[in-house]
């Protein structure tokens, strides 16, 4: 399944049906009177969170959505049928923005949640509505009201309990594949991961959802590399696991590079709880490992965990540290179905 986390969509609710001008024409009824029915109401445009979705890819191929128009009224006091609503299905974690891409309209956080984005127009009154003691045979009726139309942006922020961050090639995808059933692409070159990945992790009988996003590089907040556009997917996480490559030139500088990008992004990431771990400890000599650990400790101002995603050493300890922060009620119950959905491809 292709991954798409942003889409521009045009929506229009249905116009109301027109009211009808009609009169009763029945035998033996000399003054039948008005009998024009009202028009039906136009259909609404509704956004609904669907279980099992984790991408907005459907909106790459169709961008225009229109609800049905209400039917016109008819004689014999027959009201027009209401137009059918149109329902757009989105993944949990989707946000709706106005066309300016800045004004937040709604934020979806629960499966089954619905939001009426555009209401259909009211149907017009038929001439029977205007009958009064002074106007026994009105010959006027109202047209239906037009529906609402607008362009909107759908933006997906995946919901996970914990998020993996780090420079490209820090071993995040290897870690995710080691602790979950997720099968991200793994290779020994930067930017192997091009899209966020989700995995369901079971640690000591506790399940939670872990998100892996493409690696950050210096200047990502200015658009360098893949930029910081994927950071929104870990903005909702309760805790970040920051992996630093022990084989890099300077672990402290590597940590600060990513930390600078997180702070530049701002939002909820600046004060997010962070667990720091030195990865690939199996690939360096003991003396070099001690130097890298000390460098990272000084930069992060905390003692880093030591692990090797490749061999599994230290991985359980890292998972237990995540579980301790996530607490007793992880959001994985909401996000698990999305994490277990069909994986994305590049």
Curated annotation (Swiss-Prot):
It is found in: Cytoplasm. It comes from the Bacteria. The keyword Iron does not apply. Pfam families: GTP1_OBG, MMR_HSR1. GO terms for biological process: ribosome biogenesis. One of its GO terms (molecular function) is GTP binding. GTP binds at residues 166-173, 191-195, 212-215, 279-282, 308-310. SUPFAM superfamilies: Obg GTP-binding protein N-terminal domain, P-loop containing nucleoside triphosphate hydrolases. CDD domains: Obg (cd01898). Its cofactor is Mg(2+). Its main location: cytoplasm. Residues 160-327 form the OBG-type G domain. Monomer. Belongs to the TRAFAC class OBG-HflX-like GTPase superfamily. OBG GTPase family. NCBIfam families: Obg_CgtA, PRK12297.1, PRK12299.1. PANTHER family: DEVELOPMENTALLY REGULATED GTP-BINDING PROTEIN-RELATED (PTHR11702), MITOCHONDRIAL RIBOSOME-ASSOCIATED GTPASE 2 (PTHR11702:SF31). An essential GTPase which binds GTP, GDP and possibly (p)ppGpp with moderate affinity, with high nucleotide exchange rates and a fairly low GTP hydrolysis rate. Plays a role in control of the cell cycle, stress response, ribosome biogenesis and in those bacteria that undergo differentiation, in morphogenesis control. This is GTPase Obg. It comes from Bradyrhizobium diazoefficiens (strain JCM 10833 / BCRC 13528 / IAM 13628 / NBRC 14792 / USDA 110).
């Amino acid at each position: 399944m292709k991954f798409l986390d942003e889409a521009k969509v045009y929506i229009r609710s249905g116009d109301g049906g027109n009211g009808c001008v009609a009169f009763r024409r029945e035998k033996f009824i000399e003054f039948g009177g008005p009998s024009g029915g009202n028009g039906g109401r136009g259909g609404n445009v509704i956004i609904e969170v669907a279980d099992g979705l984790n991408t907005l890819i459907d909106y790459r191929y169709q961008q225009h959505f229109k609800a049905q128009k209400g039917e016109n009224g008819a004689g014999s006091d027959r009201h027009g049928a209401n137009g059918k609503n149109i329902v757009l299905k989105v993944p949990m974690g989707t946000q709706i923005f106005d066309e300016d891409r800045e004004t937040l309209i709604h934020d979806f956080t629960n499966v089954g949640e619905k939001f009426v984005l555009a209401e259909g127009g009211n149907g017009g009154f038929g001439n029977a509505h205007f009958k009064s003691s002074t106007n026994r045979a009105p010959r006027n009726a109202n047209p239906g009201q037009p529906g609402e139309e607008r362009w909107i942006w759908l933006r997906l922020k995946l919901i996970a309990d914990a998020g993996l961050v780090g420079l490209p090639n820090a071993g995040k995808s290897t870690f995710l594949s080691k602790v979950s059933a997720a099968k991200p692409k793994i290779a020994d070159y930067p930017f192997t991961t091009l899209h966020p990945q989700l995995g369901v992790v079971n640690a000591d009988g506790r399940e939670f959802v872990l998100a892996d996003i493409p690696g950050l590089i210096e200047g990502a907040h200015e658009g360098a590399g893949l930029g910081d556009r994927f950071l929104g997917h870990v903005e909702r996480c309760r805790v970040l696991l920051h992996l630093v490559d022990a084989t890099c030139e300077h672990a402290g500088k590597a940590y600060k590079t990513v930390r600078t990008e997180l702070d530049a992004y701002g939002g909820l990431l600046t004060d997010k709880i962070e667990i720091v771990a030195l990865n690939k400890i199996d690939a360096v000599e003991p003396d070099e490992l001690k130097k890298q650990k000390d460098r990272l400790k000084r930069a992060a101002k905390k003692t880093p965990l030591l692990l090797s995603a490749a061999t599994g050493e230290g991985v359980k300890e890292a998972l237990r540290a995540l579980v301790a922060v996530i607490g007793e009620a992880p959001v994985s119950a909401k996000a698990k179905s999305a994490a277990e959905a069909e994986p994305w491809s590049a």
